[in-house]
């Protein structure tokens, strides 16, 4: 059966070879007009969608630009305020610097008299110390042993004549014994001459 079928197919192919090759294939025929129309419709729809999308994007961009402008205006205002604030801070800093300079000068001027007084006191103290050291050097012997009078140096009192206290008279006679002794002592004479005129033995015999 299979061999008979194969032979029939061969004969049919030989007979119908020309007919089969020359017949047009319906599947390969296309309607170009319809395809063009469909393509145009598709393109028109796509362009409309693209245009709509572009419009939306433009609207969004314009909105964003307006927002950016508003933000820029706000930033400019804030920047102006910041600039004014910075200028105010600079002026305040200058005022504070001037006030600090004035306070520092006042403090220096107030400290000067105290410093001068302290310096003067220090000078006086040094001078007193030098005086004490010089006195200590004077009152010390060459060997370094202090003298006996280094503590309280008392000036010598003037010696008084004991006869003045006994006989303080100023106007008296020349024959006064005390006055004679006084004058003889002051002049450096011996005191026995004053006793000669008044001696009871002057007119009598000597022993």
Swiss-Prot record:
Matching InterPro entries, A to Z? Tex35
Q: Which residues form a coiled coil?
A: 43-79
Q: Which Pfam families match?
A: Tsc35
Q: Which domain of life is it from?
A: Eukaryota
Signal sequence region: none
The entry's keywords: Coiled coil, Nucleus
Query: Mind naming one GO cellular-component term on file for this protein?
Result: nucleus
Compartments (UniProt record): Nucleus
Tissue expression? Testis-specific. Expressed during spermatogenesis.
Q: Does the keyword Nucleus apply?
A: yes
Q: What is this protein called?
A: Testis-expressed protein 35
Q: Which organism is the protein's source?
A: Mus musculus
